[in-house]
Amino acid sequence: MQTNMKFWLGVFTFAFCMLICIGTFADAYPSKPDNPGEGAPAEDLAKYYSALRHYINLITRQRYGKRSSPEALMMTDLMLRENAESFPKYRYDEPFMW
């Protein structure tokens, strides 16, 4: 009985912690502004478009971190650089045989 109680207490604690973590992740992302509708006044539409522009700027902003450091960019360039031999040859680049 005691082990069963400890088991369910652990399950409940884990589920509660997961709900808290999911809630904090959901609050961290900005919510999309509400559309005022078809027959909305011009002032409401202006506010909506301003909020929408702000929302798009937030979710598409450039993030700076380790990937934007010069060393990381140089490594990426070296890894992705292709030499001339790695490009496939096209059949139409060669002269016609007939």
Swiss-Prot record:
Entry's Gene Ontology cellular component terms: extracellular space
Phylogenetic classification of the source organism: Eukaryota, Metazoa, Chordata, Craniata, Vertebrata
The keyword Signal is annotated on this UniProt entry: yes
Gene3D superfamilies: 6.10.250.900
Protein task: NPY is implicated in the control of feeding and in secretion of gonadotrophin-release hormone.
Signal peptide extent: 1-28
Keyword field contains Secreted: yes
Protein name in UniProt: Pro-neuropeptide Y
Pfam family, one: Hormone_3
Alphabetical list of InterPro entries matching this protein: Pancreatic_hormone-like, Pancreatic_hormone-like_CS
Chief localisation class: secreted
GO terms (BP aspect): feeding behavior; neuropeptide signaling pathway
Name of the gene: npy
Subcellular location: Secreted
Modified sites of kind Tyrosine amide: 64
Keywords, sorted A to Z: Amidation, Cleavage on pair of basic residues, Neuropeptide, Secreted, Signal
SMART domains attached to this UniProt entry: PAH
Sequence similarity: Belongs to the NPY family.
Alphabetized GO MF terms: neuropeptide hormone activity; neuropeptide Y receptor binding
